């Protein structure tokens, strides 16, 4: 299973006075089971890119493949794609709307045509996966903490049993404890379910801690793609894009400049 983008381009407002080219010839391939960090400053194109990956936006030019099939081919089942490639938007708790947590998480599976019993079984499993026990089932989602709301929203996507989970800034607005809890749950999903994870973030510290591979976007283009240690070697270029490498990267560089022999593969503490 893989996602493959070939010469992907996207233009907002094409043919109008407000035309804006958001993606330029993006080429990438994401393999089954990878944990990919997608990073870039505001306006870099990362959010536009992920909306292509599950078919919410159609490219202005280029091709996109899922499991070897061109999703732009005639008759392709976009509904099936969106159930396999789950997308959690930034501030997803704003989309919570049901009277209680369990009912809210059941919404996606029911929309897939599952019975009430099947949907509830999926929802309970998803809530367990994000660390919410049965005591939360009948609680109003609006009475939960910010981190708990975020986990309910993620469970709503997991209940649809996607093969790929894309998260757009999943820790935005959370306190440090809430941020760590969310990221640890995502990491656990990757390790225990071998789920493909695409984590969109502007935090180098977060992606260095969890991701196996980093893709850096800037002005709609893919500028770096590789292991964290390879990408962080370009920390001077990253700074020109409004990004900063993890603090440990600067420390290692300073130590080496002062003649101290230290492993420069270190990306986290």
Which stretches of residues belong to each language-model region?
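Conserved ABC ATPase "signature" region
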Residues: 118-135
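Conserved ABC ATPase signature
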Residues: 140-144, 148
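Conserved catalytic motifs of ABC-family nucleotide-binding domains
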Residues: 161
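Catalytic Walker B motif of ABC-type/P-loop ATPase nucleotide-binding domains
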Residues: 165-168
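Conserved ABC ATPase "signature" C-loop
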Residues: 219-220
